[in-house]
């Protein structure tokens, strides 16, 4: 009888709660205001031939490479960062080898590593979600072939110091080291300039968050040109759809829109953290477009916020996140709605007298 591989049969499930998302969607770290108007205008003028033809990725890759200041052979557009993670697993992981992650973190690192037949080594974050650089290095072995680090991290919003990331890349020359910068725009610091020093270093970016193109599924993976040549062998030449390729240059061309949105999100993040601190709710200072907070009765909190038209994400099942919710930030008008509903919910549930932040 036909049966999937053992690695596939034992994979954990990842079922994001997409159904019934009615309300202000602050649960998936999306751009809550939407993409640039220039993208919408481009969509209106798509020609039938563009949809009838196989997509051509290279001209758009050249534009993205120019914007990032890298050479085109160092860059690959992907079907979201998810595909970038999958491609690295397929390129570098053999069954029985090891992939290293820091937990809590993005669930798909573990799933793609396990699908490749690898053993996943989970290194717990330090107290207050401090990045455990020493502990990561201590878990590097001759079997280590992939290390995946979200920076800023999801769901905590915390960051890894560049010196730790450099030390990890230096300590694991036979492993691919992925620094996933999905929330780069809200943080502003990158490891992109380090790629020439470390040929085993890869940087991923997405256009789902700040750029508001989550529905088009487009991201980018950057690394050493020789290594990227191997990654391209695993990738389909038609992995990014024609609509995404047509719209991305317009999104990139409207940096004023991105800058305004990012500035408002950062402002909203400060406002949320101030309200949480005033209510003595523990939270993790964030460098992303979300904040993780420990509210205790997370499921009740999520339901009460939903009743007030605000969707937030229960992260209680993540390592060390018992009783926690993750709240996405948007522009000022969305922060106003969020904070009003938040205070009402805290008062109603009687959880505004929790422990101090630290």
How should each PLM-predicted stretch be described?
Residues 307-308, 317-358:
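PLP-dependent enzyme catalytic core of the Aspartate aminotransferase-like
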Residues 265-266, 274-308:
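Conserved PLP-binding catalytic core of the aspartate aminotransferase-like
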Residues 115-120:
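A short helix-loop-beta submotif of the ANL/AMP-binding
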Residues 121, 127-185:
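Active-site phosphate-binding strand-loop segment of PLP-dependent enzymes
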Residues 2-82, 87, 349, 358:
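N-terminal small-domain helix-loop-helix segment of the aminotransferase-like
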Residues 200-284:
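PLP-dependent aminotransferase class I/II
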Residues 91-112:
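Conserved PLP-anchoring active-site segment centered on the Schiff-base-forming lysine
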């Amino acid at each position: 009888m036909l049966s999937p591989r053992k690695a596939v049969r034992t994979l954990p499930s990842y079922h994001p709660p997409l159904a019934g998302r009615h309300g202000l969607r602050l649960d998936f770290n999306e751009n809550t205001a939407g993409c640039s108007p220039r993208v919408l205008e481009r969509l209106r003028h798509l020609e039938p031939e563009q949809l009838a033809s196989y997509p051509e990725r290279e001209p758009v890759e050249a534009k993205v490479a120019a914007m990032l200041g890298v050479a085109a052979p160092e860059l690959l557009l992907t079907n979201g960062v998810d595909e970038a993670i999958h491609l690295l697993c397929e390129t570098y992981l053999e069954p029985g080898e090891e992939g290293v992650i820091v937990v809590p973190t993005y669930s798909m690192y573990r799933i793609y590593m396990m699908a490749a037949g690898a053993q996943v080594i989970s290194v717990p974050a330090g107290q207050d979600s401090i990045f455990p650089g020493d502990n990561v290095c201590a878990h590097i072995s001759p079997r280590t072939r992939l290390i995946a680090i979200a920076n800023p991290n999801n769901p905590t919003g915390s960051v890894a110091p560049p010196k730790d990331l450099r030390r990890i890349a230096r300590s694991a020359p036979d492993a691919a080291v992925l620094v996933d910068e999905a929330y780069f725009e809200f943080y502003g610091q990158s490891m992109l300039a380090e790629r020439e020093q470390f040929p085993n270093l890869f940087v991923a970016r997405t256009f789902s968050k700040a750029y508001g193109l989550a529905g088009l599924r487009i991201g980018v993976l950057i690394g050493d040109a020789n290594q990227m040549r191997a990654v391209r062998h695993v990738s389909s030449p038609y992995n990014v759809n024609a609509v995404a390729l047509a719209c991305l240059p317009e999104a990139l061309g409207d940096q004023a829109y991105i800058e305004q949105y990012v500035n408002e999100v950062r402002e909203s993040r400060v406002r949320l953290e101030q309200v949480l601190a005033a209510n003595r709710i523990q939270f993790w200072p964030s460098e992303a477009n979300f904040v993780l907070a420990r509210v205790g009765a997370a499921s009740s909190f999520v339901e009460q916020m939903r009743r007030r038209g605000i969707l937030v994400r229960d992260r209680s099942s993540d390592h060390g996140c018992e009783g926690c919710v993750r709240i996405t930030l948007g522009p000022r008008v969305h922060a106003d709605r969020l904070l009003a509903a938040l205070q009402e919910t805290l008062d109603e549930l009687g959880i505004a007298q929790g422990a101090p932040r630290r």
